[in-house]
C-alpha cells in the first residue's frame, strides 16, 4: 500500500511538471520604491493624474487621455516615449484618499505582456515613500529574455521615481 501511494505521488508530480512546460512563465515582478523628503500630499500631487506621466517621467514626451477622465476606473491613456513609440494603458483602480492607482497595458511595443502595475504614496516620518510595483511576462516572440524585460521595467521605474524625488524635493 505504501509503495502504491509513493508511486501515485511521483506520477502526479511528474504529470504536474510536464503540464507546466506548456504554461506561460510564472511571471516577473518589478518592485521599486524611493524615500522622498516631502509630504505625501505634495508627492501625490505630482504622480496622481493618469494623463500626467510625461510631466514627471523623463522617458515620456506625451500622455493623452483617450477615454474617460483622470481618477476614473476604465480611463485610457496613450503615452508616447521620447524616441517615438506610443502605447495604450487603462486605469484599473484609483483611490485618491489612499494615494494609489493601478493600471494595465492594453497595447505596447514593449517586450512585455500581461503587464499590470500599481503606484502608491505612503507617509514615512516627515516624508513619503513612493512604491511602484509591476507584474508582467516577457512577450513571446519578442526576442528578449526575462532578464531583458526585468531590466527594462526596473530601469523605467527607477528613472521615474528618481525624477519624482527631484521634483518633490525641489532639486
Write out the residue ranges for each language-model feature.
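Positively charged n-region of N-terminal signal peptides that target proteins for export
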Residues: 1-4
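Bacterial N-terminal signal peptides
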Residues: 7-15
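Hydrophobic ligand-binding cavity/cleft-lining segments
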Residues: 17-67
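A conserved amphipathic terminal alpha-helix motif
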Residues: 18-19, 23, 129-131, 135-171
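Soluble non-cytosolic domains of exported or imported proteins
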Residues: 34-41, 47, 51, 111-112, ...
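Hydrophobic pocket/interface hotspot
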Residues: 42-46, 53, 77, 91, ...
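Sec-exported extracytoplasmic/periplasmic mature domains
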Residues: 48-58, 83, 93-96, 138, ...
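Hydrophobic-ligand binding "helix-grip"
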Residues: 81-129, 135-137, 167
Amino acid at each position: 500500500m505504501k509503495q502504491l501511494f509513493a508511486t501515485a505521488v511521483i506520477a502526479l508530480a511528474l504529470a504536474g511538471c510536464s503540464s507546466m512546460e506548456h504554461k506561460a512563465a510564472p511571471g516577473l515582478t518589478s518592485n521599486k520604491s524611493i524615500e522622498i523628503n516631502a509630504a505625501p500630499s505634495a508627492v501625490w500631487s505630482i504622480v496622481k493624474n493618469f494623463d500626467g506621466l510625461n510631466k514627471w517621467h523623463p522617458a515620456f514626451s506625451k500622455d493623452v487621455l483617450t477615454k474617460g477622465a483622470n481618477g476614473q476606473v476604465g480611463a485610457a491613456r496613450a503615452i508616447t516615449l521620447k524616441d517615438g513609440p506610443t502605447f495604450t494603458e487603462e486605469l484599473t483602480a484609483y483611490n485618491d484618499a489612499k494615494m494609489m492607482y493601478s493600471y494595465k497595458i492594453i497595447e505596447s511595443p514593449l517586450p512585455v505582456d500581461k503587464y499590470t502595475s500599481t503606484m502608491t504614496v505612503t507617509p514615512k516620518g516627515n516624508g513619503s515613500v513612493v512604491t511602484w510595483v509591476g507584474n508582467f511576462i516577457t512577450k513571446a516572440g519578442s526576442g528578449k529574455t526575462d532578464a531583458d524585460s526585468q531590466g527594462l521595467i526596473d530601469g523605467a521605474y527607477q528613472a521615474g521615481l528618481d525624477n519624482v524625488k527631484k521634483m518633490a524635493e525641489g532639486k
